[in-house]
Amino acid sequence: MPNELVFDEVFAANRPEFVKNSGLNSFSAETALIFGLSQEHIIARNEVQLQLEALNALDGLIADAAQSGLDLAVASSYRSFERQALIFNRKLRGERAVLDDNDRVLDRDQYSDTEWLQAILRFSALPGTSRHHWGTDLDVFDRASLRGDLQLTVSESQTLFADLHVWLDERMAKDKSFGFFRPYAVDRGGVSPEPWHLSYAPLATLYENAMAPNLWREVFAELGDVLDNFNLLDRHLEKIFERFVAVPKGWCPDHYRSGLTS
């Protein structure tokens, strides 16, 4: 897997003019964190980028997995706004593959703009709304079971990495997963199930309710013309948030929301 820290350093050196000229100092520290516009909250360790508390919890999870013969590894952790915007715009333009639920590449010409947007959002977060911006979320796999290139698909999770995910299921059911749970465990008709996507609940629950359509609009008013087909996004924004951004509270035990992490 690519080194995301190196990626972001390269991207920063060649940062688009819309980021250079966006006046990021006008945003609060919390807003910059939530939208992936700052890396001040991020610590890099062994190519993994998370907040320090989440990194320390991850160390515990990895060590626990090793006791069960699993080599839990991280495919992706922190993701900057810039990177998410680059990915999203390339998909909007049809320059990067968009897949269906059966991992088949879709033909852009066969879809209306609205249908194409929905197909993208099934697997890729709207920039500024990705949980990977927060330094609390990561994608995992079992390095010892990897054969060939990593795809991060549901079928892969049910075959190559089945042992890892069964183990995670058991640890989460006992609340012994060091605070990590799955926000996209089931298909609710929006984001595709992502069994590999783990979120550190003690911190993630602090940020998820701060995201709202009006805040997104305020930030993008400052950033300027950074996303293709912005008018389409703006027109459907409330529905996008309802279907593809909001995650029901039941994704983690309630006590993590009160700051109690027994």
List PLM regions with ranges.
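Cell-envelope/glycan interface and biosynthesis
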Residues: P2-T261
